[in-house]
């Protein structure tokens, strides 16, 4: 059962902990909780000559996320040699810094602007309807597996198009495997150890294969007329008016945009549907809102804009179980944070999860309470599911459109209830907080009541569920 976060003292001790840095990748959330409890807003872990710095307050989040001269981004820690495919496929927007990043973001901003979102709406609806074809009343679904596969199809279609859906889906699957391999070896760039180095050669081979497949896609895709709008077509259009967008750079952009979008959005779907299943009264309210405002089989853009409570549900899900639990910057020049001097090369971790669970920022922070969004308006550095500052996720509007549209379609047709004796585990892997077990739920017709069904698992260490949702032994402990 999760510790009472509100009882954690925030008065800092000396901010440096001399202990194994491997504690962080083994259990990032618990490690950060302990550091925050012990040291307050800033902490440093030291082991021999290695250091990891952590910031846990909105003000320090702001300093790290706005000072792009002192703190550089490195989306993937393992870049490969300068002439390697690994270097090229990791050279997109998310790995750029300084003037290069500003120029690229300016070129790409129209690709993800709100004015293009209506063009993606039919694809989002179509793929969600495909998902729901097998969601018959009484059937049991594994929300974890289904949302990962759903977002693999969705991200592939929106980024690469539906004209050759099979190839786009396979390319998306290839990128997904490559992302996982990066995690396997990438932590060694932050925390040295032989276990992080053994798969490096395999990663380089995967990058070669991935680059070749992306170039094949470019060849197929360029100069075609496409059934539906997609990001790659818009990237080619931007390339035609900018000499800065070579095919090599587009390869990096396409790879990293997919990597950033796929699993984070899949986890947001899984957690939101799980939280609704565990809070039947909220499920009933949001389903009622959808039924009241969505009159056809598909929600229109105007109808989606009227779903205020659904928006609150999504915001609260991303607060209490943020798919991006933490991220990091690398110190680029000597800098001081809260009196702590940091040298170039030092990783600095900031945590959405810890910030979102601070009781001085959010009342009862470990509870899922969508109604809090009626009265609160947190700053961008207090609530940052998509990051903040000049590097805030460029695809945030598209991600929100996907989530809101798909959830409206799902809730229009059904509700969900957890199956008996389910175990739900969550863990941070490669900065992302996602399910590591099945999330087994039963499909209930839209008009019927649902009930809270107790679940087991480490989910209770991450979020405070209603007392009815706790197994009997945990109810007694509570």
Describe the role of every protein-language-model region.
Residues 36, 128, 174-176, 291-296, ...:
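Cytochrome P450 proximal C-terminal region
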Residues 10-15, 125, 173-177, 226-231, ...:
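Cytochrome P450 I-helix active-site segment
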Residues 89-90, 255, 260, 298-302, ...:
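Cytochrome P450 heme-thiolate "Cys pocket" and heme-binding signature region
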Residues 2-9, 73-81, 85, 100, ...:
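Cytochrome P450 heme-thiolate monooxygenase catalytic core
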Residues 2-22, 30-119, 130, 147, ...:
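Cytochrome P450 substrate-recognition site 1
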Residues 67-70, 350-376, 456-459:
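Conserved cytochrome P450 K-helix/beta-meander segment immediately N-terminal to the heme-binding cysteine loop
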Residues 20-40, 212, 216, 297-338, ...:
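Conserved cytochrome P450 K-helix E-x-x-R motif and the immediately C-terminal K′/meander segment
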Residues 262-289, 397-412:
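Cytochrome P450 catalytic-core helices
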């Amino acid at each position: 059962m999760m510790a009472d976060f509100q009882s954690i003292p925030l008065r800092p001790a000396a901010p440096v902990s001399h202990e194994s840095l491997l504690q962080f990748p083994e259990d990032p959330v618990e490690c950060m909780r302990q550091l925050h409890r012990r040291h307050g807003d800033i902490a440093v872990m030291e082991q021999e000559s290695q250091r990891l710095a952590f910031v846990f307050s909105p003000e320090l989040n702001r300093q790290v996320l706005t000072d792009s001269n002192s703190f550089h981004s490195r989306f993937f820690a393992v870049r490969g040699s300068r002439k390697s495919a690994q270097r090229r496929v990791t050279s997109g927007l998310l790995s750029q810094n300084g003037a290069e990043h500003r120029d690229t973001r300016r070129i790409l901003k129209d690709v993800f602007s709100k004015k293009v979102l209506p063009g993606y709406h039919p694809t989002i609806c179509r793929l969600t309807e495909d998902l729901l074809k097998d969601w018959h009343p009484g059937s049991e679904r594994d929300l974890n597996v289904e949302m990962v596969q759903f977002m693999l199809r969705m991200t592939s279609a929106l980024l690469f198009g539906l004209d050759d859906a099979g190839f786009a889906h396979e390319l998306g699957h290839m990128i997904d495997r490559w992302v996982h391999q990066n995690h396997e070896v990438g932590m060694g760039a932050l925390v040295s150890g032989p276990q992080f180095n053994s798969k490096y050669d395999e990663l380089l081979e995967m990058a070669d294969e991935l680059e070749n497949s992306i170039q094949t896609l470019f060849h197929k895709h360029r100069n075609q007329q496409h059934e539906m709008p997609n990001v790659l077509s818009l990237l080619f259009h931007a390339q035609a008016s900018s000499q800065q967008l070579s095919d090599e750079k587009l390869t990096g952009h396409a790879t990293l945009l997919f990597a950033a979008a796929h699993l984070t959005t899949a986890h947001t779907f899984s957690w939101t549907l799980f939280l609704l299943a565990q809070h039947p009264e909220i499920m009933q309210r949001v389903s009622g809102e959808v039924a009241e405002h969505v009159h056809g089989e598909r929600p229109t853009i105007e109808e989606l804009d009227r779903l205020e409570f659904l928006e609150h549900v999504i915001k609260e899900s991303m607060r209490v179980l943020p798919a991006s639990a933490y991220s990091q910057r690398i110190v680029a020049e000597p800098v001081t944070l809260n009196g702590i001097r940091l040298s170039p090369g030092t990783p600095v971790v900031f945590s959405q999860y810890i910030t979102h669970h601070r009781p001085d920022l959010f009342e009862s922070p470990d509870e899922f309470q969508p109604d809090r969004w009626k009265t609160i308006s947190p700053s961008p550095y207090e609530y940052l599911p998509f990051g903040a500052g000049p590097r805030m996720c460029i695809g945030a509007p598209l991600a929100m459109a996907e989530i809101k549209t798909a959830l409206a379609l799902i809730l229009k047709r059904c509700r969900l209830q957890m199956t008996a004796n389910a175990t739900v585990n969550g863990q941070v892997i490669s900065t992302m907080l996602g399910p590591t077990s099945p999330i087994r739920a039963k499909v209930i017709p839209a008009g019927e009541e649902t009930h809270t069904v107790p679940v087991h698992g480490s989910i209770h260490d991450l979020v405070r569920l209603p007392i009815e949702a706790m197994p009997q032994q945990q109810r007694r402990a509570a």
